[in-house]
Amino acid sequence: MKEFKAVFPKALIIFIIFTILCGGIYTIFITGISQLIFPKQANGSIIEVNGKKYGSVLLAQQYNDEKHLWGRIMNIDTNTFVDENGKKLAYSAPSNLSPASKEYEALVQERVDKIKENHPEQDEQAIPVDLVTCSGSGLDPHISVAAAKYQINRIAKNNNMEVKDVENIIDKYTSGKLFGVLGEKTVNVLEVNLAIDGILK
């Protein structure tokens, strides 16, 4: 008991000091630095034009009309979780279906059929895999350059645009490899679609 009484005050003081340092000072310091150096990224990388917010470059938005670039398959569940007021909350995750299952095979085939139906001019071309599969998060905002180029003719036709103009937009919103060597080039779907709509210049 005596040992406890001797150690406890010291432990409590250390606990309080580190709580203030790590939970307070460090948090305030990092938040301040991020707001100073990376204000856009620190606030969610929101795309805002003329005071209107269109979304984040880090989160996918669903596009499935003929005029826009399609992204990866999104798995959004709005039936599982609700808040304290009963409002449905969006939840995203992979399907967890086995790649070897018949159910997954049928699901992918359905997606393949939809892609082919909307891109008849690409009948002989292999469909990029990211157009018929979802990412681990189900909210991936990027697609491969191949997946974007696969859709160019459809987008140009339905927007009365030149193919070259669509290509230029895709090139503008294509990110290179990390440090020039890691990963692959990717295209941000939301930015491309906002540019097609004339919102981003």
UniProtKB/Swiss-Prot annotation:
Part of the high-affinity ATP-driven potassium transport (or Kdp) system, which catalyzes the hydrolysis of ATP coupled with the electrogenic transport of potassium into the cytoplasm. This subunit acts as a catalytic chaperone that increases the ATP-binding affinity of the ATP-hydrolyzing subunit KdpB by the formation of a transient KdpB/KdpC/ATP ternary complex. Belongs to the KdpC family. This is Potassium-transporting ATPase KdpC subunit. The keyword Cell membrane applies. The system is composed of three essential subunits: KdpA, KdpB and KdpC. The chain crosses the membrane at residues 13-33. One of its GO terms (molecular function) is P-type potassium transmembrane transporter activity. The keyword Lyase does not apply. It is a single-pass membrane protein. InterPro entries: KdpC. Disulfide bonds: none annotated. The gene is kdpC. It comes from Clostridium botulinum (strain Alaska E43 / Type E3). It is found in: Cell membrane. Pfam families: KdpC.
